[in-house]
Amino acid sequence: MLYIIRQILQPLLAMIMSLNMMIFPVTEDRVPEEMDQVQNVIYLIGDGMGPLHLEKAKQERNISLVMETFEYSGRSMTRSQFNAVTDSAAGATALACGVRTINGYVGVFYYDPLCVESTPRNLTELCIEKGMMTGIVTTDKTSGATPSGFSVHTDSRNNTKDIDTQQMNSDIDLIWGATSSYISQETCEANGFTFVKTYSEMMALEEGGCSFAQFDNGTWYTEQYDDETPTLSQMTTKAIDLLDDTDEGFFLMVEGAHIDKNSHDNEDAGMTEAVEEFDNAVAVALEYAKNDGNTLIVVTADHETGGIVLNDDGTYSFTQGSHSGANVPLFVYGSDTFIENGEVVYNIDIPARIAYSLGFDKDDMPYERFADWVNVVVENVAK
């Protein structure tokens, strides 16, 4: 019976997919014809970080920001497939896979959330196929929306067990963040990962192995939460040290998740501290890139949270506890061709430009990976 249903549905789904591509055609080419080539990429995402988050942090903490010293800066537009305001899952999918999807979906096409026909390939997978080392570092739990966008394909950001399972079955060299429900030392080691729980265990890691970290939820502070919980900048430093171990280069995604989390609660002190520590991680990346000379740094956000506004008295304040549709910052170091100063780009263009900077063809990102049965149907139709 299942065989009969499969035979009926497969050609129908293939036809729907073809019609969809005609109704929603691929957008015009928005990747520059010439792109400076690099070996490594450090992609830093400040979750919920709008331009006024930066101004508020500078004002209230009396600091300057390393990211604002980058030679090139612009803005990114953040909408999802059907919403002017994206969530973190769709935002991560755009930044990782170069496609728009529905809020709540992670790493899937909006018209095929169960991956029946095809899935979009993310930057991490693309780099693994090239032989590069890859890593994901976050202050969120490892199954959070942003790290999930760079590591899994699922129809809901709340599918924690599915996300944890896909990550543990992946070929990513390191996945570090806060504790997620279904991750354990036994499951990690069974899948070839060294299980890491503390700062000292992280620092003891040596090149050549894979690691899965489950830290306490205090990694976003500017100072160590306790002796055994690293900060985001410390994680970034160690991750770069471990990934810089191959002639093929590396790809590292670093997320500062607590800019968003504190903005949802309109917590001024927490949000500004999270911005400062995220910028500390940017400083780590910049120091490495300056010494290396062959590394691209891209700093941006998935969306803005809190609707921060400038008041008449020159201060900044939150106006809401949810996401907004505001454009977000985009800073670039290590390429004279990635963006023009002041350029406004679609969020889905950023991973395409990253891929092109790494030497991939324009057709490689976004890339539609078809299920085996779709290829068979297409081949039969062609005959």
Briefly describe each language-model feature range:
Residues A145-S151, G218-D226, T236-I240, D244-L286:
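Active-site His/acidic residue clusters
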